[in-house]
Every structure is written in structure tokens, then in C-alpha cells.
Curated annotation (Swiss-Prot):
Job description of the protein: Two distinct, membrane-bound, FAD-containing enzymes are responsible for the catalysis of fumarate and succinate interconversion; fumarate reductase is used in anaerobic growth, and succinate dehydrogenase is used in aerobic growth. Anchors the catalytic components of the fumarate reductase complex to the cell inner membrane, binds quinones.
Keywords: Cell inner membrane, Cell membrane, Membrane, Transmembrane, Transmembrane helix
Species the sequence originates in: Yersinia pestis bv. Antiqua (strain Angola)
One term of GO molecular function: succinate dehydrogenase activity
Protein name stated in the entry: Fumarate reductase subunit C
Location of the protein in the cell: Cell inner membrane
Length: 130
């Protein structure tokens, strides 16, 4: 059986996500994947430069000193921090921790995740510099 009625198609503008702050922040957070791809490609380039010997490594280090590359790496750092912040805020919603018959709030878990991140980063930095 076919119908002669036209299907209702709701119009949607290409910039629909710009109307609400929630959607703008969501798009910004999802956009942090682009700097992550940049950093992944940069790491792969560094590994292959290291494989090619001292001359290749020196070329990679001079590439890293380019102001544009430095700017992209700083942008990538901020994108990674934003992504980390949003995931750390999401973690307490996925886990119910009950202490003395009361559900623990999200703040202790978020703070603990940041402490672990800072400690792990400090250890990695110390090992790299020693």
C-alpha cells in the first residue's frame, strides 16, 4: 500500500550546532581529535628520523624548532588538556563509588585523576631528563 502524502522533512541549517553552547562545546571537544592526529604523525616522523641515524634525528629536532610546528604543538597540548578535562569529568558519572552507605561525589575522583596525571607526567619527565 502506498500513500500519496508527502513525507515531512524537517529543514536543518548547516550551522545548527552553533545555536546552543552545549553543541558548540561538543564540537570543540570532538575537534580535539585533529591535533591528536597531528601529534601522532609527528611521533611517527620522529621514530623514523631516529631510525635513520644522528643526521635524521638532527633534522627532526630542527623541524621541531620551526615556529609553526611549535605553535601547533602548543595548540595540541591545549587540545589534549581540554579532552582530558572532559573525560575526567565524565569518569565519576560512569562509576558509582559508595563509602559508608553514601554515594561519593565527583570531586574526589576528578582530583585523584588529575593527581595521577601530574605524578605520571612528572615521573616521565624526570626519566627523560636524567
Amino acid at each position: 500500500m502506498t500513500t500519496k502524502r508527502k513525507a515531512y522533512v524537517r529543514t536543518m541549517a548547516p550551522n545548527w550546532w552553533q545555536q546552543l553552547g552545549f553543541y558548540r562545546f561538543y564540537m570543540l571537544r570532538e575537534g580535539t581529535s585533529i591535533p591528536a592526529v597531528w601529534f601522532s604523525v609527528l611521533l611517527i616522523y620522529g621514530v623514523f628520523s631516529l631510525k635513520s641515524g644522528p643526521a635524521g634525528w638532527e633534522g627532526f629536532v630542527s623541524f621541531l624548532q620551526n615556529p609553526l610546528v611549535l605553535f601547533l604543538n602548543i595548540l595540541t597540548l591545549f587540545a589534549a588538556l581540554l579532552h582530558t578535562k572532559t573525560w575526567f569529568e565524565l569518569a565519576p558519572k560512569a562509576v558509582n563509588i559508595i563509602v559508608k552507605s553514601e554515594k561519593m561525589g565527583p570531586e574526589p575522583m576528578i582530583k585523584a585523576l588529575w593527581v595521577v596525571t601530574v605524578v605520571a607526567s612528572a615521573i616521565i619527565l624526570a626519566v627523560a631528563l636524567l
